[in-house]
């Protein structure tokens, strides 16, 4: 029997919410504390993504699932300053909203 996937989906939503709260505190490209906090939550999000069922992920084909999972490796293995803050901000600004919409849809569908 496989583990329930819903807690991982909730971890993703929680990480997205935290990232938005971090952004509300200032520009993460200019503040290393905010930047580090955002990176940590992106790592959490990217670690939870592969634990979602593939059949659920196929319902959101526009989400780059493999890239999200791969982003975790970049975050973990390039932690010594090789990650461009502007790229991170762009990922947050352009990709978290569709991901959140997809995860919410997965959870809503599961409750029906």
Residue map of PLM features:
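Solvent-exposed interaction patches of small proteins and small membrane subunits
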Residues: 1-112
């Amino acid at each position: 029997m496989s583990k329930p996937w819903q807690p991982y989906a909730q971890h993703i939503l929680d990480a997205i919410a935290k990232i938005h709260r971090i952004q509300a505190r200032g520009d993460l490209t200019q503040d290393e504390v905010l930047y580090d906090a955002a990176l940590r939550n992106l790592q959490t999000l990217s670690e939870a993504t592969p634990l979602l069922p593939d059949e659920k992920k196929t319902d959101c084909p526009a989400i780059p699932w493999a890239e999200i999972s791969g982003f975790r490796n970049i975050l973990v293995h390039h932690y010594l300053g090789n990650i461009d803050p502007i790229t991170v901000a762009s990922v947050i600004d352009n990709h978290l909203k569709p991901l959140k919409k997809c995860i919410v849809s997965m959870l809503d569908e599961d409750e029906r």
